[in-house]
Amino acid sequence: MADRLTQLQICLDQLIQQFNSTINYVNTSAEPSLLDDDDVNSYSNMAANAPLPQSQQQRQQQKKQQEPQQEIEQPQQQSNPESKSISPPKEKVSFDNVINELCTDLILKSRQIKMLIDSLPGIGVTPNEQMNLINELSDKLQAIEEERIQKIKEKDNLLNLLESMIKEVVNGITETRI
């Protein structure tokens, strides 16, 4: 598992990617609208009045083609007493659902980043306490390294003892055969 700083960097990269994907989705899927209450010809609202990209023009043409079909279906639904409530178009509901899901993903990722930041050392710890902790860890590491060197020496001694015992057994076997 990666250390906390690497995890934090990965989460930040993922958050940036999610922001980018969300903005791209809104940019390509949302209906153009005025940004503020200024005049329609103001600079801030010119984007809403700009010609539509080809993909959005195709979508609007498809909608217009589907409208006559929906008008045929609506009288049938109006005769049904259960369908008295007016529901928003399916595309609007779908767009809103996707936006809610994307927002939830962004919120969860930002909470994950906050938890990683909170788990980082140094917050609420003075530099002296950090140095003391580093010194303690360094002392523990030196003790473990000395123990490791001692165990290596012990292993080498045991190997030498085993080798000498094997030589004695081999010599004993050869002497009995001669």
Curated annotation (Swiss-Prot):
Residues 67-85 have a biased composition (Low complexity). Residues 36-91 are annotated as: Disordered. Residues 128-169 form a coiled coil. It comes from the Eukaryota. This is Mediator of RNA polymerase II transcription subunit 21. Keywords: Activator, Coiled coil, Nucleus, Transcription, Transcription regulation. Pfam families: Med21. GO terms for molecular function: transcription coregulator activity. GO terms for biological process: regulation of transcription by RNA polymerase II. The keyword Nucleus applies. Component of the Mediator complex. GO terms for cellular component: mediator complex.
